[in-house]
Amino acid sequence: MERKRVYTFGNGKAEGKADMRNLLGGKGANLAEMNLIGVPVPPGFTITTDVCSEYYDLGKDKVVELLKADVEKAIANIETLMNSKFGDVANPLLVSVRSGARASMPGMMDTILNLGLNDEVVEGMSRKTNNPRFAWDSYRRFVQMYGDVVLGMKPTNKEDIDPFEAIIEEVKEAKGVKLDNELDVEDLKTLVAKFKAAVKAQTGKDFPTSAYEQLWGAICAVFDSWMNERAILYRKMEGIPAEWGTAVSVQAMVFGNMGETSATGVCFSRDAGNGEDLFNGEYLINAQGEDVVAGIRTPQQITKIGSQRWAERAGISEEDRIAKYPSMEEAMPEIYKQLDELQTKLENHYRDMQDMEFTVQEGKLWFLQTRNGKRTGAAMVKIAIDLLHQGMIDEKTALARIEPNKLDELLHPVFDKTA
């Protein structure tokens, strides 16, 4: 029997499940599992870790040939569920491409968002969303990410300048503005043209315009990143065998930057710092994933209590907080209610503190990923004990959750919270 290389997920169905980490990677297994328990996840598919081994054994061309029919069928499945078409001008489907090994590890390929855009599709997207700035901003981000990650233009050391960042600075300076979001549509068009010229100058090739050419480039870049220097070094340190390989997850894009009813954020089912059983997180209205962690805009708190605590620490009055930095609980109560229900569902399902990423596209909530959250030593102990007392785990599991090397943190002095 022909081995199965591509597993689809979407609309509450999935060919994979949580215990298939070895084959689908951590991310792919979780995306499948979330679908199966009724969490809204944008549809997509995962290419297995076995294919990564085939990639190194048989070579790139052979693997693309082996995958072609399965990937095209999986894309057609996403098109049906999202009611849009890959590479289509009038009603475009865009996708994200992510790497996902069984253990999360640095050095692996960064995520690529907005794949499927070109000069024609961006105009179609502009008309469809009635938001040209959003369409061109998505395109600008895509060319930059693809150039950095797939075409190898990202600087390898801190001293080198990222060619794309240099162009952004140059355009901002010429315009006399400080922030990226102060650039208008015409500026973004200029950026795209300059970005593509930089790609041609550095790689000798034009930026790929075909959606499938872009997709194959990104898929192969994930497999290539498995053998990059940082990844190899990390595996040596952690004792991870090279033959594990990485999976590739391709997923329909959902957009948090389609206006005031869209948002993006990250949240935790408990406090990762002190272990308090308090749902918390940050979000930004009209923004895309990276913006929350990039520090370009001040993210707002998800819960009202979190927002009030944050304002108190930052010396912001309650009037100012409500006017300028309202919590999601206050600004988007319906979405907040759904988010709160789903984070509880996920924590109960995985029986551990969850770190989740989500996007709201025009009033519809989508979960992008969930994983067991990283936590401090103190939080680790408190969460394990609380979960035990709440009947979610037994004593044996609680003990197994205590990492001995983290206990060392508890022996060091810490700042007094009340100080």
Language-model features, listed with the residues they occupy:
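Nucleotide/phosphate-binding sheet-loop regions of phosphoryl- and nucleotidyl-transfer enzymes
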Residues: M1-A419
